[in-house]
């Protein structure tokens, strides 16, 4: 089973004018195909980091890990966990099973 907290480190940093940067690092002993909406997707071998820059005004984002993936040179393929429409670069949410992290930015302070 894939556990996001145990395998990927996700850190966020506020940038100029409300833009946000996420650094997603694979701390697993195996390859993970990270996915994000918005953001797409990227293969991460052990120790690799994927930086996702979200534009100012992006209200929300979600990130998850995919395992057991195979993709061809055009980015078409599939994953055993977290598959997102048989694409390397996700444009739809991942299928279960998947553990994800969500980010929402608003002016509400609770």
UniProtKB/Swiss-Prot annotation:
Gene3D superfamilies: Thaumatin (2.60.110.10). It holds the Pfam family Thaumatin. Keywords: Allergen, Pathogenesis-related protein, Plant defense, Signal. Residues 1-19 form the signal peptide. The keyword Signal applies. GO terms for biological process: defense response. The keyword Translocase does not apply. PROSITE patterns: THAUMATIN_1, THAUMATIN_2. Belongs to the thaumatin family. This is Pathogenesis-related protein. It comes from Juniperus virginiana (Eastern redcedar).
């Amino acid at each position: 089973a894939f556990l996001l907290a145990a395998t990927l480190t996700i850190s966020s940093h506020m940038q100029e004018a409300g833009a946000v940067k996420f650094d997603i690092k694979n701390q697993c002993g195996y390859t993970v195909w990270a996915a994000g909406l918005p953001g797409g997707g990227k293969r991460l071998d052990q120790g690799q980091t994927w930086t996702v820059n979200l534009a100012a005004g992006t209200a929300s984002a979600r990130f998850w890990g995919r395992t057991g993936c195979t993709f061809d040179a055009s980015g078409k393929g599939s994953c055993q966990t977290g598959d997102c429409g048989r694409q390397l670069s996700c444009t739809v949410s991942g299928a279960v099973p998947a553990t994800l992290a969500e980010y929402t930015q608003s002016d509400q302070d609770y």
